[in-house]
C-alpha cells in the first residue's frame, strides 16, 4: 500500500512539474469548455465561414475562440496545442495528454454573466470552447470547465491552399481554406487576367471581399500568412469559373 501511495504522490509531483515547465516554455494559461456533441456535428459552420468541417478537411478537432483570441476573425485557421493544467485541477485532467485544435468559430461574450461565473468567453479571458472529441482527449467530461495551458503551433494540411469564390456581378467573396503553416491570413490580393493586383479586405472570418467585375477572367491570388510568408498563386481560378465553386492550388504555406 505504501508503494502505491508513493507512486501516486510521485505522479502528482511530475504533473505539477510538467505544467510548471510548460508554462515556462512559451505556454499561456487559459480555460476551456466544450460543445457540439460526441461527433462534433454541432461545431459545423461557425464564424470563420468554413461550413462543413468534415468535407473541408478540418475534422472534429476544432474550437471556438473567445473574443480576445478570435481577433475579429484574423485567427481563423490557426492551430493550438492545448493541455489540461493538472497542477490546478488534477482530478479533472487526463495527465500527460495534449490535443491540437484548429480555430473555426467564435465563442461570443455573455455580458449577463460574470467573467468567472459563466461568462467564460468575455474579454479579456483567453478561452477555448472545444469540440467534445478534442475536450475528452485532455479532460474529464463531468468537469465542464478546466484550466488549460496552450500555445500556437504549426498547422499541417493535406494538399494545397483552396479558394471558394462566391458573390454576384461586382462583388466577390473569397473564402480561403486549408492553409498550413501559421494557418491564418493577414493580407490578400486578387488579379484578374484583365486587371492589375486588387487588394482584398476581410469581410468576416476567413472570407475576403472584392468590389470589382471579375467574371470571365482567370484569377490569381497573392496571399500573406500571419507568419509573414507570401505566396503568389497564378491562375488558380480558370476564366470559366462560376460563383460557389472551389479551386485547389498546388502551393502551400510553410509558416
UniProtKB/Swiss-Prot annotation:
GO terms for biological process: plant-type cell wall loosening. GO terms for cellular component: extracellular region; membrane. CDD domains: DPBB_EXPA_N. PROSITE patterns: EXPANSIN_CBD, EXPANSIN_EG45. Residues 170-249 form the Expansin-like CBD domain. SMART domains: DPBB_1. It is found in: Secreted, Cell wall; Membrane. Residues 45-160 form the Expansin-like EG45 domain. Pfam families: DPBB_1 (PF03330), Expansin_C (PF01357). Keywords: Cell wall, Cell wall biogenesis/degradation, Membrane, Secreted, Signal. Residues 1-21 form the signal peptide. Its main location: secreted. It is a peripheral membrane protein. Belongs to the expansin family. Expansin A subfamily. May cause loosening and extension of plant cell walls by disrupting non-covalent bonding between cellulose microfibrils and matrix glucans. No enzymatic activity has been found. May be required for rapid internodal elongation in deepwater rice during submergence. This is Expansin-A28.
Amino acid at each position: 500500500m505504501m508503494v502505491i501511495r508513493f507512486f501516486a504522490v510521485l505522479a502528482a509531483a511530475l504533473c505539477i512539474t510538467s505544467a510548471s515547465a510548460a508554462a515556462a516554455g512559451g505556454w499561456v494559461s487559459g480555460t476551456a469548455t466544450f460543445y457540439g456533441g460526441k461527433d462534433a456535428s454541432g461545431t459545423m459552420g461557425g464564424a470563420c465561414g468554413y461550413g462543413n468541417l468534415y468535407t473541408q478537411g478540418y475534422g472534429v478537432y476544432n474550437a471556438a475562440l473567445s473574443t480576445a483570441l478570435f481577433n475579429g476573425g484574423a485567427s481563423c485557421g490557426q492551430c493550438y496545442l492545448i493541455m489540461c493544467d493538472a497542477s490546478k485541477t488534477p482530478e479533472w485532467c487526463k495527465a500527460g495528454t495534449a490535443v491540437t485544435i484548429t480555430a473555426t468559430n467564435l465563442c461570443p461574450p455573455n455580458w449577463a454573466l460574470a467573467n468567472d461565473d459563466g461568462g467564460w468567453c468575455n474579454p479579456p479571458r483567453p478561452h477555448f470552447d472545444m469540440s467534445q472529441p478534442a475536450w475528452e482527449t485532455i479532460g474529464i467530461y463531468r468537469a465542464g470547465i478546466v484550466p488549460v495551458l496552450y500555445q500556437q503551433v504549426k498547422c499541417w494540411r493535406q494538399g494545397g491552399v483552396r479558394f471558394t469564390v462566391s458573390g454576384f456581378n461586382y462583388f466577390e467573396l473569397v473564402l480561403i481554406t486549408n492553409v498550413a503553416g501559421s494557418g491564418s491570413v493577414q493580407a490578400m490580393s486578387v488579379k484578374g487576367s484583365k486587371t492589375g493586383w486588387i487588394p482584398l479586405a476581410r469581410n468576416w472570418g476567413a472570407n475576403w471581399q472584392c468590389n470589382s467585375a471579375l467574371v470571365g477572367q482567370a484569377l490569381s491570388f497573392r496571399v500573406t500568412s500571419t507568419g509573414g510568408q507570401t505566396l503568389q498563386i497564378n491562375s488558380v481560378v480558370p476564366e470559366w469559373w462560376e460563383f460557389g465553386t472551389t479551386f485547389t492550388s498546388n502551393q502551400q504555406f510553410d509558416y
